[in-house]
């Protein structure tokens, strides 16, 4: 059986959920290898299927002066080393159709950024790699849009797709998480993932001393969104994790501290075990009789 189909079936059958986790961006080979080692150790303790995440390029940074990563060539070499050294699947994002083919040679899951979730050419190019496609819901999109995005992948010949909630714009410089989306996105007929870290971004919400703005975030609310997501019954959790969030070069305010990863996962597993969120409630509307 095709490796992508095998992994996709494994993720669909994950109990209680699968995990996409890692630092936001590749900072160095040494750092990424160390993070992968620790995250795999923790996820293995709980028997949670892990897909290690990191980006080779942050193409939509608020400022052109901001750190973006090592680039596609060096970044993919590092991710491939992680994949081989720790025997874990990899997820990373693409920003242009031309990136899909080389990324598909390394990554097991190709992620479509939220800002690009409706870009047909990008979705089709990603789909044609045959890899699993994780589509993040645009901050500007209704959940129903994700059914169309997933269908674009399927019509390109790839049934291995999943969709990811990452918050909705709530005025300027803020996002809100609507738990109803986690249910409505099931209309896409594929696994639903909750991004519990980016959902708490405050885009361009932090003024810099030297002028300009950067994205802030509400890290302290990550457990709240995570608890809600597993109670609702999502199939997967996406979270960015860092060993030193205050000094992370990208999205530090929304990266979860590595030292608290085990503690949070333990709680989320306990919540998911008692929740019936993955089963629809059978509502009886016939008249009540004494």
From Swiss-Prot:
Pfam families: DAHP_synth_1 (PF00793). It catalyses: D-arabinose 5-phosphate + phosphoenolpyruvate + H2O = 3-deoxy-alpha-D-manno-2-octulosonate-8-phosphate + phosphate. The keyword Cytoplasm applies. The gene is KDSA. It comes from the Eukaryota. Keywords: Cytoplasm, Transferase. InterPro entries: Aldolase_TIM, DAHP1/KDSA, KDO8P_synthase. GO terms for cellular component: cytoplasm. GO terms for biological process: biosynthetic process. Belongs to the KdsA family. GO terms for molecular function: 3-deoxy-8-phosphooctulonate synthase activity. PANTHER family: PHOSPHO-2-DEHYDRO-3-DEOXYHEPTONATE ALDOLASE. This is 2-dehydro-3-deoxyphosphooctonate aldolase. It is found in: Cytoplasm. NCBIfam families: KDO8P_synth, PRK05198.1. It comes from Pisum sativum (Garden pea). Its EC number is 2.5.1.55. SUPFAM superfamilies: Aldolase.
């Amino acid at each position: 059986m095709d490796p992508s189909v095998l992994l996709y079936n494994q993720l669909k059958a994950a109990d209680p959920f699968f995990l996409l986790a890692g630092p936001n961006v590749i900072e160095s080979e040494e750092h990424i290898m160390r993070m992968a080692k620790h995250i795999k150790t923790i996820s293995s303790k709980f028997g949670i299927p892990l897909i290690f995440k990191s980006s080779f390029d942050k193409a939509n940074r608020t400022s052109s002066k901001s750190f973006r990563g090592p680039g596609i060539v060096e970044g993919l070499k590092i991710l491939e080393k992680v994949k081989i050294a720790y025997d874990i699947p990899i997820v990373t994002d693409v920003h242009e159709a031309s990136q899909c083919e080389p990324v598909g040679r390394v990554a097991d899951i190709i992620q479509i950024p939220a800002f690009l979730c409706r870009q047909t050419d990008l979705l089709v190019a990603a789909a044609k790699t045959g890899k699993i496609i994780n589509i993040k819901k645009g901050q500007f999109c209704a959940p129903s849009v994700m059914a169309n995005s997933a269908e674009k992948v399927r019509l390109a010949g790839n049934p291995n797709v999943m969709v990811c909630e990452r918050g909705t714009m709530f005025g300027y410089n803020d996002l809100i998480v609507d738990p109803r989306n986690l249910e409505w996105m099931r209309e896409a007929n594929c696994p639903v993932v909750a991004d519990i870290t980016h959902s708490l971004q405050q885009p361009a919400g932090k003024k810099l001393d030297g002028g300009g703005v950067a994205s802030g975030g509400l890290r302290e609310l990550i457990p709240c969104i995570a608890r809600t997501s597993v109670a609702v019954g999502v199939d997967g959790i996406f979270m960015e994790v860092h060993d030193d969030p205050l000094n992370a070069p990208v999205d530090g305010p929304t990266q979860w501290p590595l030292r608290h990863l085990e503690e949070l996962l333990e709680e989320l597993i306990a919540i998911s075990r008692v929740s019936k969120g993955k089963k629809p409630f059978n509502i009886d509307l016939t008249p009540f009789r004494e």
